[in-house]
Amino acid sequence: MDLAYDGAAFAGFAPQPGRDTVVGALGEAIARTLRLDAAPFIVGAGRTDAGVHALAQVISLDLGAAVLSEDSTDWFLRSLNHQLRGRVVVARARVLDDFHARFDATWRQYRYLVATGPALAATSALAWAVAAPLDLAAMNDASACLVGVHDFRAFCKRAPDKTPDEPLLRHVYEATWTDEPDRLGVAAAGGFVVFRIRANAFCHNQVRRLVGSLVAVGRGELVPEEIAARLQSGDARRLPAPAPAAGLALVGVGYDDLHGGPSGPGAPIR
């Protein structure tokens, strides 16, 4: 299933007892629609944090004895979207065997918006408002070192089960900043800069921590070479704070056309 949602309304994607989450809201709607005794187990391609949006999240779930045929997916979508009332929008549902939204994904793409112009006061739910001028050339120089396979320990929030010296290897395919309009019209009116990053996977807080440091480069608070040096050393001490969640959105998930499976937008968002 392909989803979109405004992350400001949720405490995150993954279920949390006593808190409103994307999985919680969606699971309840599915259970009501199919008259299940309990919400199904839902797997997402990306586990977005509180406040992080998604334009192209992909999920998989096993409905067990509740058989949903390809012919009934339109009814299923209408029922879910009616119950969710725009909090989560389900764009597509397909019946596939052995599809796993997380483990079958070959890449994920995130986009981060920074508001730099007249729209600063009106964009707090969608972008990070940064009043200082930003040097995009320096930010792109700093971003170039991210492409390839690297240990991102310096730019990730370490999970409790990971030791401090354990590498967090991720393969980044692209990482660029632009002030040009993208396919969704973002930045078309000016006053925005857009960071796009695509990788095989991301560790916790990785994009927001990278953006926080790259914006510091754009402000002249860090030199571009500092990003490469931190990748090499793994040292996170005295790095800038992570960028706010509001500017971040999951905008694409790619699959190698497994079983004709979903692929988010089908290509990286431009």
Where are these regions (language model features)?
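Structured-RNA-binding interfaces characteristic of tRNA pseudouridine synthases
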Residues: 1-270
